[in-house]
């Protein structure tokens, strides 16, 4: 990075070099816009990140915790929630308008934004057509903090109803650890076998943890 680059203010640096050139503190400073009394915006940004440990911690904070931080309030909370939701919808639209699912990373990022911070286990299915384009996504089963009862026949029933040719399975582990259990492996195999009887392919099963994930396809388990 050049000396000129390091002396630019965040807004000017973004305009000249792009958003990816900014670090977390600089990005947050643009979002905050102004500092508070005796605390310039860059210093406030640094304090906020230290308080929440990371951007992820800030984004995941509930309203009460968020607004307890000096310099933050309901306006910033609402704006941040709106930005987060727009990101989710952008990723979903990327999947919806893609000609086919050629980017597993886009699928993973979307599933992470949807499932990573849920406090209950949710089992989601992406239903795809024969060219692997998204038909619909559906939260099929909602469970407790550590378990969701999954009924493979209900998944197949929905797949047949929307004429899906392929499926991507996903669920979260609220514990934060994405390592699959034996029950996860058995359930995935049951869905795969039942799907094959109906000539429907299971392309992958993602398990989403806190800042980590597990892909059955990447491990060669599907």
From Swiss-Prot:
Keywords: Hydrolase, Metal-binding, Metalloprotease, Protease, Zinc. Residues 99-222 form the MPN domain. Coiled coil: none annotated. InterPro entries: MPN, RadC_JAB, RuvA_2-like, UPF0758, UPF0758_CS, UPF0758_N. One of its GO terms (molecular function) is metallopeptidase activity. Zn(2+) binds at residues 171, 173, 184. A motif (JAMM motif) lies at residues 171-184. It holds the Pfam family UPF0758_N. GO terms for biological process: proteolysis. Belongs to the UPF0758 family. NCBIfam families: PRK00024.1 (NF000642), radc (TIGR00608). This is UPF0758 protein HSM_0009.
């Amino acid at each position: 990075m050049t000396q000129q680059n390091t002396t630019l203010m965040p807004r000017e640096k973004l305009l000249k070099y792009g958003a990816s050139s900014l670090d977390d503190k600089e990005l947050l400073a643009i979002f905050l816009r102004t500092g508070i009394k005796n605390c310039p915006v860059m210093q406030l940004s640094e304090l906020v990140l230290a308080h929440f440990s990371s951007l992820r911690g800030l984004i995941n904070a509930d309203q009460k915790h968020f607004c307890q931080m000096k310099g933050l309030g309901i306006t910033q909370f609402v704006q941040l929630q709106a930005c987060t939701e727009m990101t989710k919808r952008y990723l979903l639209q990327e999947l919806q308008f893609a000609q086919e699912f050629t980017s597993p990373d886009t699928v993973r990022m979307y599933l992470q934004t949807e499932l990573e911070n849920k406090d209950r286990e949710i089992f989601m299915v992406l239903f795809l057509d024969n060219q692997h384009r998204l038909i619909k996504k559906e939260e099929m089963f909602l469970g407790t903090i550590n378990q969701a009862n999954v009924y493979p026949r209900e998944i197949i029933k929905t797949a047949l109803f929307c004429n899906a040719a392929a499926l991507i399975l996903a669920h979260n582990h609220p514990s934060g650890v994405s390592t699959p259990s034996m029950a996860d492996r058995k359930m995935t195999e049951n869905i795969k076998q039942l799907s094959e009887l109906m000539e429907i392919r299971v392309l992958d099963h993602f398990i989403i943890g806190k800042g980590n994930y597990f892909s059955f396809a990447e491990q060669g388990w599907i």
